Curated annotation (Swiss-Prot):
Protein name in UniProt: N-terminal Xaa-Pro-Lys N-methyltransferase 1
Pfam family, one: Methyltransf_PK
UniProt KW keywords: Acetylation, Methyltransferase, Nucleus, S-adenosyl-L-methionine, Transferase
Upper lineage: Eukaryota, Metazoa, Chordata, Craniata, Vertebrata
Organism: Ailuropoda melanoleuca
Reaction it catalyzes: N-terminal L-alanyl-L-prolyl-L-lysyl-[protein] + 3 S-adenosyl-L-methionine = N-terminal N,N,N-trimethyl-L-alanyl-L-prolyl-L-lysyl-[protein] + 3 S-adenosyl-L-homocysteine + 3 H(+); N-terminal L-seryl-L-prolyl-L-lysyl-[protein] + 3 S-adenosyl-L-methionine = N-terminal N,N,N-trimethyl-L-seryl-L-prolyl-L-lysyl-[protein] + 3 S-adenosyl-L-homocysteine + 3 H(+); N-terminal L-prolyl-L-prolyl-L-lysyl-[protein] + 2 S-adenosyl-L-methionine = N-terminal N,N-dimethyl-L-prolyl-L-prolyl-L-lysyl-[protein] + 2 S-adenosyl-L-homocysteine + 2 H(+)
Binding site for S-adenosyl-L-methionine: G69, R74, D91, V92, T93, L119, Q120, Q135
Transmembrane regions listed in the UniProt entry: none
Modification N-acetylmethionine, positions: M1
Length: 223
């Protein structure tokens, strides 16, 4: 439980916001110095996502996606824009969203909205998104705020839409990172929060070929 490791919720959010303001708006900055893993990450994400986009009666649409904790648009550029007609981005750091406009290049014209907002305060437009992608950002929300955000995301899905969480998972319990003011939860804790938000797990996969010294990374598809 985040309530056991976060002493002051207001400070938890403020400290994270301050931390990201000092991070350079680059791929390396977004990935905490692990920019070299970006291609491995995107390639696996594409395979994971495409199983839901294939032909079939319940296939997920490709009209519109939402990139949560989007930063400068690394995932929007490499994963979402090639697969979806329109993408919206949301991030708490305004400088990242400003940088995104040049980083995304010509294809960036298909980014419809740049929302500058913390996810704890963000509500996706109901019935708007085929895919809501939430990567390396759930650790910046308390358990309660994460459950509430996922409930709002559920409302934001179009028919056959999915939510994807891709994030670090701890071996056991909840670990606080005091540097960037985030938490890392184990899979059981994340599963519990997902269930409390009224979502079902459709698929789960561990990311392969990452450096040994970093946390295990899992993708979860939810509806």
């Amino acid at each position: 439980m985040t309530s056991e490791v976060i002493e002051d919720e207001k400070q938890f959010y403020l400290k994270a916001k301050t931390y990201w303001k000092e991070v350079p708006p680059t791929v390396d900055g977004m990935l905490g110095g692990y920019g070299h893993i970006s291609s491995i990450d995107i390639s696996s994400s594409r395979k994971f996502l495409q199983r839901f986009l294939r032909e079939g009666p319940n296939k997920t649409g490709t009209s519109c996606a939402l990139d949560c904790g989007a930063g400068i648009g690394r995932i929007t550029k490499r994963l979402l824009l090639p697969l979806f007609g329109v993408v919206d981005m949301v991030d708490v750091t305004e400088d990242f969203l400003i940088k995104a406009r040049t980083y995304l290049g010509e294809e960036g014209k298909r980014v419809r909205n740049y929302f500058c907002c913390g996810l704890q305060d963000f509500s996706p437009e109901p019935n708007s998104y085929d895919v809501i992608w939430i990567q390396w950002v759930i650790g910046h929300l308390t358990d309660q705020h994460l459950a509430e955000f996922l409930r709002r995301c559920k409302q934001g899905l179009r028919p056959n839409g999915i939510i994807v969480i891709k994030d670090n998972m701890a071996q056991e319990g909840v670990i606080l990172d005091d540097v960037d003011s985030s938490v890392c939860r184990d899979l059981d804790v994340v599963h519990r929060i997902v269930r409390s938000a009224g979502l079902s797990l459709l698929a789960e996969e561990r990311q392969e070929n990452l450096p040994d010294e970093i946390y295990h990374v899992y993708s979860l598809a939810l509806r």
